[in-house]
Swiss-Prot record:
Alphabetical list of CDD domains matching this protein: cytochrome_b_C (cd00290), Cytochrome_b_N (cd00284)
Official protein name in the record: Cytochrome b
Protein family per UniProt: Belongs to the cytochrome b family.
Lineage, broadest ranks: Eukaryota, Metazoa, Chordata, Craniata, Vertebrata
Subcellular localization, as worded in the UniProt entry: Mitochondrion inner membrane
Note: Heme 1 (or BL or b562) is low-potential and absorbs at about 562 nm, and heme 2 (or BH or b566) is high-potential and absorbs at about 566 nm.
Coiled-coil positions: none
Annotated cofactor note: Binds 2 heme b groups non-covalently.
Cofactors required: heme b
Organism: Tragulus napu
Purpose: Component of the ubiquinol-cytochrome c reductase complex (complex III or cytochrome b-c1 complex) that is part of the mitochondrial respiratory chain. The b-c1 complex mediates electron transfer from ubiquinol to cytochrome c. Contributes to the generation of a proton gradient across the mitochondrial membrane that is then used for ATP synthesis.
GO cellular component: mitochondrial inner membrane; respiratory chain complex III
Subcellular location, principal: mitochondrion
């Protein structure tokens, strides 16, 4: 009799995706982040669901309802901080996952990569809207500043902003719709993640060498299931250390002050995971130019397959490209630091130089390095 795992219509899908899936024998811990992102997503949906049971999306009670969750709801504080810091872990895993894709040339799986970029944008939109919900000072002013960027669009900008706000300023209508979108988008992300997996399983995983591994495959279970469990334990350890010892480490103290449209905080800044993009936005003095640079900083990922000039897929055997990759990583950390600093000398100049370097590395230096490495290898 055939194994039920291989014959049952539902079990068969799970089996082909997580049990009997042929996987390369040499994939490193950098391949753990996909499963960690799945765990983060499930954690965020569950904690978010319990938060939504007690949260009210009205401007007069939103801030109080979050305080009520932390003070009066059984274990509400841990649910709230798991959700807030879970978002930080989500983005750490996301950026590591994207970095892995860039380093090992995984972007040559076009459909998987493109769905991945759409996923990144959707997660960023969801996180932004979630940050508005507690209705603190930084929630309100962050929402005002970021939505206002759309007014830079010629002709329709102002109407578009007022349409998104549902009025002439960020108010009740804005908060209610942001809550609605923040609730629905994680399920859209889940669907997109399944499509992402679907396309990945059409081709199979890449590996650190970038060389096809069809000749040497091993079953996903038990080899990579146990490896993913180890990754999940490390993720949960870091998350719990954050939540239980310094839950507000990555947050902004201004968000413990209720939103006040009449009082602007001295430094408006988003959560830490958006600071690099915020720094790029601020580095251009023109509003429309800044908005375009902001969009380009993420959408540039879609160009990666077109900018690949090397005859090798991975950077494993390409020292010049490796140096440029780590320079890019350092540049992103610099931009993250600058995004959290006030707009004054020398931060403005550092931000502008870091922004120029960011686009130069991706658009110019990396493709040139690929050509040089081909020549060095007499290809």
């Amino acid at each position: 009799m055939i194994n039920i795992r291989k014959s049952h219509p539902l079990m068969k899908i799970v089996n082909n995706a997580f049990i009997d899936l042929p996987a390369p024998s040499n994939i490193s811990s950098w391949w753990n982040f996909g499963s960690l992102l799945g765990i983060c997503l499930i954690l965020q949906i569950l904690t978010g669901l319990f938060l939504a049971m007690h949260y009210t999306s009205d401007t007069s009670t939103a801030f109080s309802s979050v305080t009520h969750i932390c003070r009066d709801v059984n274990y509400g504080w841990i649910i709230r901080y798991m959700h807030a810091n879970g978002a930080s872990m989500f983005f750490i895993c996301l950026y590591m996952h994207v970095g892995r894709g860039l380093y090992y040339g995984s972007y040559t799986f076009l459909e998987t990569w493109n769905i991945g970029v759409i996923l990144l944008l959707t997660v960023m939109a969801t996180a932004f809207m979630g940050y508005v919900l507690p209705w603190g000072q930084m929630s309100f002013w962050g929402a005002t500043v970021i939505t206002n960027l759309l007014s830079a669009i010629p002709y329709i900008g102002t109407e578009l902003v007022e349409w998104i706000w549902g009025g002439f300023s960020v108010d009740k209508a804005t908060l209610t719709r942001f809550f609605a979108f923040h609730f629905i988008l994680p399920f859209v992300i889940t669907a997109l993640a399944l499509v992402h997996l679907l396309f990945l399983h059409e081709t199979g995983s890449n590996n650190p060498t970038g060389i096809p591994s069809d000749a040497d495959k091993i079953p996903f279970h038990p080899y990579y299931t146990i490896k993913d469990v180890l990754g999940a334990l490390v993720l949960m350890l870091v998350l719990l250390l954050l939540v239980l010892f310094s839950p507000d480490l990555l947050g902004d103290p201004d968000n413990y002050t209720p939103a006040n449209p009449l009082n602007t905080p001295p430094h408006i800044k988003p959560e830490w995971y958006f600071l690099f993009a915020y720094a790029i936005l601020r580095s251009i003095p023109n509003k429309l130019g800044g908005v375009l640079a902001l969009i380009a900083s993420i959408l540039i990922l879609q160009l990666m397959p077109l900018l690949h000039t090397s005859k090798q897929r991975s950077m494993m055997f390409r020292p010049i490209s490796q140096c440029l990759f780590w320079l890019l990583a350092a540049d992103l950390l610099t931009l993250t630091w600058i995004g959290g600093q006030p707009v004054e000398h020398p931060y403005v100049v550092i931000g502008q130089l870091a922004s120029i370097l960011y686009f130069s590395i991706i658009l110019v230096l990396m493709p040139v390095a690929g050509v040089i490495e081909n020549k060095m290898l007499k290809w």
